[in-house]
Amino acid sequence: KRRGIRIVFDTNYRARNWPDPSIARTAYGGLAGVIDVMLAGEEDIALLFGRSDTDVALREWLDFERCEVVLKCGSGDSRIWAEGREWRASAEHVDKVVDTTAAGDSFAAAFLAARLSGAAPDEAARAGHRLAAEVIRHPGAIIPITAMPNLALVTESTSAIVP
């Protein structure tokens, strides 16, 4: 961090890798003061806390002033706590889902690329949703280069700042 490097952590929680969810919560929570961005899947947080109100669980668990938090919610709106406020971005509707492999990683890649390019949190999340939507239209984790969306064109806002 002293050299200007941003540190990102994706929870990618797998219960079988931890003896108890409380140990994972403590380990992950301890990273909040070290990392710049935490990416968490809604399912991961629900499993970690044993509850469905994931945004409340995150608020109780993390100090949002210390790191940017991105809650990925599958086909639902993503929620981002950054720059002192909460942001939301709508997921793109996909008529025919072929394979969800790499959807979360695709969201993360586009989100981070957009943020590093100076995009606001909501614009970055929209870029993440756009790439994830394209990826799930294809089998497997690697899509044809011709199917890659131009994420620079993701400019029209469909998200909202939550007061």
Go through each PLM region and give its residues.
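Conserved beta-alpha-beta core of the PfkB/ribokinase-like small-molecule kinase fold
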Residues: K1-R59, S75-S78
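Conserved phosphate-binding/catalytic region of the ribokinase-like
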Residues: G50-P163
